[in-house]
UniProtKB/Swiss-Prot annotation:
It catalyses: an S-(2-hydroxyacyl)glutathione + H2O = a 2-hydroxy carboxylate + glutathione + H(+). CDD domains: hydroxyacylglutathione_hydrolase_MBL-fold. It comes from Cupriavidus taiwanensis (strain DSM 17343 / BCRC 17206 / CCUG 44338 / CIP 107171 / LMG 19424 / R1) (Ralstonia taiwanensis (strain LMG 19424)). Its EC number is 3.1.2.6. GO terms for biological process: methylglyoxal catabolic process to D-lactate via S-lactoyl-glutathione. It holds the Pfam family HAGH_C. Belongs to the metallo-beta-lactamase superfamily. Glyoxalase II family. Keywords: Hydrolase, Metal-binding, Zinc. The gene is gloB. InterPro entries: Clx_II_MBL, Glyoxalase_II_hydrolase, HAGH_C, Hydroxyacylglutathione_Hdrlase, Metallo-B-lactamas, RibonucZ/Hydroxyglut_hydro. This is Hydroxyacylglutathione hydrolase. Pathway: Secondary metabolite metabolism; methylglyoxal degradation; (R)-lactate from methylglyoxal: step 2/2. Monomer.
Amino acid sequence: MLKVEPIPAFQDNYIWAIHDGHCAAVVDPGEAAPVERFLAQSGLALGAIVITHHHGDHQGGVAGLLAAHPRAPSGGPLPVLGPAGERIGGRTQALREGDVATLEAPALTLRVLDVPGHTAGHIAYVADLGEAGPALFCGDTLFASGCGRLFEGTPAQMLASLDKLAALPGDTRVYCAHEYTRSNVRFARAVEPGNAALAAWEARVEALRATNQPTLPTTIAHERQVNPFLRSREPAVRAAVSAHGGTAADDAQNFGALRGWKDNFR
């Protein structure tokens, strides 16, 4: 049975390790040292590297990991998966929407989705983890109760990307790359103070973070209830954006105003 474990990195990153008890694929290793410690402590071999986008805190550890683990457990070159539309160091397989990547160690199939917005070529991976169910590895596109900043894409692109993710089965577990949940929930509460599900989630988040536990994974069904960026078309969210001074001629402009509000929220 496949398991997913977080490897904390930097101040608030999560590198996700997908493993079968013998070999691990690591998602978005921004630095190598935490991965090396995890592998040593867990007795796992590195089987693959999986990248969602080009930012350094997501691929900065690739060179170091390849230097230490040039070969996969099978003896061939270590697979490095990444978006076709971005520069990824050491990449062996360039992926885009509709591609399906198959790993041997661990045995894992990853379906690729294009999710531009945070960066122009950002991709996400949907995995069927067997008994553990479906999982989404979405980098900096969808966060718990939030979404990534628009560094390279447009509001319309990010809205379309989030719509695509929101359409996944509700039990899909969401593995994003940052522990931003506490600040995201504070903003979400400002947008929807009357959202009862969000109030309950805020209490849960505070309890988890008080003991330094991850708030991830969440699920797509949960995000539909508590994430303002998946709820941007809801009347209450639209009204809040308008009251904050946002203009909304269409859904994309409304989303852009919501994202701009978050960018300046303190």
